A protein has these predicted regions:
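Basic, Gly/Ser/Thr-rich N-terminal segments that form RNA-phosphate-binding interfaces in CRISPR RAMP
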Residues: 1-305
């Protein structure tokens, strides 16, 4: 009862907390889907000794062709930066004759560099955007292999051939994209046709926040069971340090002036870190437990410390 009374008194008098756990780790939250539009595919180029990273930003064709498709006088279609790699027959395309899931998996392992042909598609139903769809993959001899035929109800407006990119799978090895989310039918290929992708340095604290987000997936899974038939994503129950190496793929969020990286995240729509931990907030508000008698607040003086 004394603890309840003292806690109420702390609140009423805006006193310091008399007891406050470590709480030094950042918490995470489920991001708004609209925020995904600001994310830029990225690839790690160099691991720095101070814990920071050098990354390259892979902006698809937008540096060369612009961020919107404006054909035929239509309302402009924002173009997705990463290409869609359909994970099976579920989606806006179907396997080409003679191609199958086993061949697709063998040619598109996570983080593998691939050469591919792409078609620019206008989203056929909900949403108003354009996306690049992988239609061909090149084999080890440099021959293009037809992988997907795009459905007749999907309008295609442009194409790119022999594009080099990197496969990004958020589903764990061996799992389907739809096993992570039922409506998910695509993985991604990060690419940039500019010839000179922009390189930016990432501060150590941004990298630490990325690791915290990865850890949060495992913590969330411990608290909440998966739906029947679903599988955890690639970032669950893994050591965050294992995900960061030269060649690692992720998404970057830049500052408004695009001069620095403010966040690195593993998925377009998923968990994001709060900018400060509970302990940092408490310190800024000067409500952490006192460290010397001169800091005593009303609750400390009444109930002791």
């Amino acid at each position: 009862i004394k603890g309840m009374i003292s806690r109420a008194y702390e609140t009423l008098t805006c006193s310091r907390f008399r007891v406050f756990g470590d709480h030094s780790r950042q918490l995470t939250y489920r991001a708004d889907a609209a925020n995904a539009l600001r994310l830029i595919p990225a690839r790690v180029i160099e691991m720095n000794e101070d814990g920071g990273l050098l990354i390259e930003l892979l902006r698809g064709d937008t540096i060369v062709n612009g961020v919107e498709y404006n054909g035929n006088g239509d309302r402009p279609y924002p173009v997705m930066l990463a290409a869609s790699l359909q994970d099976g027959n579920k989606g806006h395309a179907r396997f080409a004759p003679g191609f199958n899931m086993d061949r697709l998996r063998a040619m598109t392992r996570h983080e593998r560099q691939v050469r591919c042909n792409l078609k620019l598609c206008l989203h056929p139903s909900s949403g108003h955007y354009a996306y690049w769809q992988v239609t061909h993959l090149y084999d080890n001899h440099g021959n293009p292999i037809r992988v997907f035929d795009i459905n007749d109800n999907v309008r295609t407006v442009d194409s790119l051939e022999d594009v080099t990119g990197y496969v990004y799978r958020t589903a764990a090895d061996g799992d389907r994209a739809s096993q992570v989310f039922q409506r998910k039918h695509d993985e991604r290929v990060f690419f940039d046709i500019s010839g000179q992708p922009e390189r930016v340095s990432t501060a150590p604290h941004v990298v630490d926040s990325y690791r915290r987000v990865v850890e949060s997936y495992s913590e969330q899974r411990e608290e909440k069971d998966l739906q029947r038939g679903m599988r955890p994503n690639r970032f669950t129950n893994v050591d965050p340090s294992d995900l960061l190496h030269v060649g690692s793929l992720m998404y970057a969020l830049l500052s408004e002036d695009e001069t620095r990286v403010v966040e690195l995240v593993p998925t377009m729509i998923g968990r994001r870190p709060y900018s400060r931990s509970p302990r940092e907030l408490a310190a800024a508000q000067k409500v952490l437990p006192l460290t010397k008698s001169t800091e005593a607040s009303a609750a400390d003086r009444l109930f002791g410390y």
